[in-house]
Amino acid sequence: MAAAITDMADLEELSRLSPLPPGSPGSAARGRAEPPEEEEEEEEEEEEAEAEAVAALLLNGGSGGGGGGGGGGVGGGEAETMSEPSPESASQAGEDEDEEEDDEEEEDESSSSGGGEEESSAESLVGSSGGSSSDETRSLSPGAASSSSGDGDGKEGLEEPKGPRGSQGGGGGGSSSSSVVSSGGDEGYGTGGGGSSATSGGRRGSLEMSSDGEPLSRMDSEDSISSTIMDVDSTISSGRSTPAMMNGQGSTTSSSKNIAYNCCWDQCQACFNSSPDLADHIRSIHVDGQRGGVFVCLWKGCKVYNTPSTSQSWLQRHMLTHSGDKPFKCVVGGCNASFASQGGLARHVPTHFSQQNSSKVSSQPKAKEESPSKAGMNKRRKLKNKRRRSLPRPHDFFDAQTLDAIRHRAICFNLSAHIESLGKGHSVVFHSTVIAKRKEDSGKIKLLLHWMPEDILPDVWVNESERHQLKTKVVHLSKLPKDTALLLDPNIYRTMPQKRLKRTLIRKVFNLYLSKQ
């Protein structure tokens, strides 16, 4: 412990006495105002007291730093043998200590308790003796490694960190890096792996020595972390979507934007936040306000702009296309569709049930394909025929016009054959006219009668005395000659289907058999 404090004092004296090359970073720091001698002495006394306290903690706790497999760290709190620092590295360390002292003065002025929280470079030297390499600048061979840490190694096993931790790093075996002159901070620490190097920093920036001896200045990782946290907070408050907010889900709900619904009616500048409000405004102000029986749409850009109409309901339905309101919602559960007109809703609702029927029909062929047996094929054929019979006829040609045509033909047929008026519905009444007359050798007079309707009965010669009886002749429909009866009407002797004819014959034979018994 005494050797470490002596080395620290020698390091400070060398840093004050050694000249700095022009243009080096230390020259700018040396140009700053140095603190008074009394304050320096007080700070040195505080540093020595803190160093002794840390050494006592290290010796009592027995915490040792992890030394590398080919590195320069030793365990158990043993002091590491240090080589004599070069003038350039000593001057650089002195400059670093001057900067630390200036920063300590500023923190003492801002907070009375700041001096107790900060730790000097002597503490880092003593802490490094418990398991870290020296804070002196040394050049290492490619096969060797050194591990450096802040004052946090001595306190890690005793108390929890109070402030933000510095960067903790561990390198692989056989790596080489330059040691760090740490300015000290709140609980900054670094742990060295097997032959690895680790750097630590506190709240203030640390100086890292490169291989060529020039200091490399970098910002604390805590500052960058805090700035990142502030960016995330501002992003969350503004409602923007960031990858940090997504949490692996791929998307987040962004803040809803207010969409303005403007009324484009002539000489109307109203603006609304929703389409239902705009629709109510149009209906109450512009549609219901029109009087006189003539209704026009004065929406700017409308294809029927200023076109008069006598239907107010048409104008109300038409204005729904301008307002974008869809008040007619689907009544089927789970469907969120809405429509601007009731007709659109009426066309939409049956699609739900047609989809269900189609899904059932589509599931049936799958079941059929699974069992393509002969019995299944016969069953399918029967179902197909049954379905075909049960289906109604798509076309019905017996309409009113066809009925009028049949009635007209029946009237004409009755006028010629008198079936309904004189034949009692089953006989045809023929009327005769004399078309010829002759006198035979015996002196008798013969008359040639022609029957009406024509071409059904043949002409016949009768005696003149029989003329009065044969003016009319009634013939049953079944007695008419079949070759000429079709001329009377084609439906009288209509051909019967073969199956129906067989059925009729079987019934007649059965009735005849029953009558004989």
Swiss-Prot record:
Q: What does this protein's UniProt record list under function?
A: Acts as an accessory subunit for the core Polycomb repressive complex 2 (PRC2), which mediates histone H3K27 (H3K27me3) trimethylation on chromatin leading to transcriptional repression of the affected target gene. Plays a role in nucleosome localization of the PRC2 complex.
Q: Does the keyword Repressor apply?
A: yes
Region Interaction with RBBP4: which residues? Answer: 209-294
Q: Per UniProt, what is the name of the gene that codes for the protein in this document?
A: AEBP2
What lineage, starting at the top, does this entry show? Answer: Eukaryota, Metazoa, Chordata, Craniata, Vertebrata
UniProt GO cellular component terms: chromatin; ESC/E(Z) complex; nucleoplasm
Q: Where is this region: Interaction with SUZ12?
A: 407-478
Q: Name one GO molecular function term.
A: DNA binding
Q: Note down the stretches annotated as region Disordered.
A: 1-229, 352-394
Q: Which residues carry this modification: N-acetylalanine?
A: A2
| Bias (Acidic residues) ranges | 36-51, 94-121
Is Ubl conjugation found in the keyword set? no
Q: Ranges of Basic residues compositional bias?
A: 377-392
Q: Which residues carry this modification: Phosphoserine?
A: S18, S24, S141, S206, S210, S211, S390
Name this protein carries in UniProt: Zinc finger protein AEBP2
- The region called Important for nucleosome binding activity of the PRC2 complex is annotated at 495-517
Q: What quaternary structure, including any partners, is listed in this protein's UniProt entry?
A: Self-associates. Associates with the PRC2 complex, which consists of the core components EED, EZH1 or EZH2, SUZ12, and RBBP4, and various combinations of accessory subunits including AEBP2, JARID2, PHF19, MTF2 and EPOP. Found in a monomeric PRC2.2 (class 2) complex consisting of at least SUZ12, RBBP4, AEBP2 and JARID2. Within the PRC2 complex, interacts directly with SUZ12; competes with PHF19 for SUZ12 binding. Interacts with EED, EZH2, and RBBP4. May also interact with RBBP7.
Ranges annotated as C2H2-type zinc finger:
261-286, 300-322, 328-352
Annotated Polar residues bias: 352-365
Subcellular location as annotated:
Nucleus
